[in-house]
């Protein structure tokens, strides 16, 4: 609903049947699993198929293990646009110099994941989110950082854009996964990675805003609300 063209999910074989009947709107790339998670065969499978796709998103539903580290490193060594979320952010820290790649990488951490990625203590990030986001974006100029907190900080090459659209409903588990998906869709439609990140965070926050009751709000409501948005054109957002 956010405008993505075609989508392929690379998943452990043990959950492929469930996903196959859940929706008709994506394709599946099955990988042998081990104890319910990716086996080491996932590394070769990604290598063999990565050139079939323009954007690679990694992290959602994965775990902190060596397979995740290897998959993230392989993706970052490619010439593809990459979106990192969840445990892929932890994995990226293991070889963080790869974030200095020439192609776009968009990272979507919440505060704890930002701590995993950078090694900066959670309390420091909470007290100085603007500065932490700005400094990170200066050190990794090809990256666009979307730092999620009560406010959202979108940082690129030392410029920070602040989305002040607080919504308690977005603290619910799964909301960040939906943002990651919208980011992927926008990255496929916008030539500029910063514009993609700005549009995605706006769509995400405004879709959630249509549900006033944060107590009954569910993350899938964001998806259902996207067609109901009356979007404004974001041409030159205000920098801070």
Task: Please provide the spans of the model-predicted regions.
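Short "domain-exit" segments at the C-terminal end of structured domains
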Residues: 236-240
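Small-residue (G/A/S/T)-rich helix-start motifs and N-terminal tracts that mark the onset
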Residues: 1-81, 90-106, 111-235
